[in-house]
Curated annotation (Swiss-Prot):
HAMAP family: Ribosomal_uL29 (MF_00374). This is Large ribosomal subunit protein uL29. Keywords: Ribonucleoprotein, Ribosomal protein. GO terms for molecular function: structural constituent of ribosome. It comes from Brucella canis (strain ATCC 23365 / NCTC 10854 / RM-666). One of its GO terms (biological process) is translation. It comes from the Bacteria. PANTHER family: 60S RIBOSOMAL PROTEIN L35/50S RIBOSOMAL PROTEIN L29 (PTHR10916), LARGE RIBOSOMAL SUBUNIT PROTEIN UL29C (PTHR10916:SF0). Belongs to the universal ribosomal protein uL29 family. The keyword Ribonucleoprotein applies. One of its GO terms (cellular component) is cytosolic large ribosomal subunit.
Length: 66
């Protein structure tokens, strides 16, 4: 997910997306532990998407306060 795509979304949409990614991250972690994970690069991609969403959500929250 690109940063521009994330910035275009509202805070509610970002929170929904964050929840979805956290569930996916849990499932990927579980697959890795059981040896069923095929796309190992997806773990890194999901982790970075979560960080990107959290960062932009924080920026939007700060802008709305100011």
């Amino acid at each position: 997910m690109k940063a521009a795509d994330v910035r275009a979304k509202s805070l509610d949409q970002l929170n929904d997306e964050l929840g979805t990614l956290k569930k996916e991250q849990f499932n990927l972690r579980f697959q890795k532990a059981t040896g069923q994970l095929e796309k190992t690069a997806r773990v890194k991609q999901v982790r970075r998407d979560i960080a990107r969403i959290k960062t932009i959500a924080r920026q939007k929250a700060a802008e709305s306060k100011a």
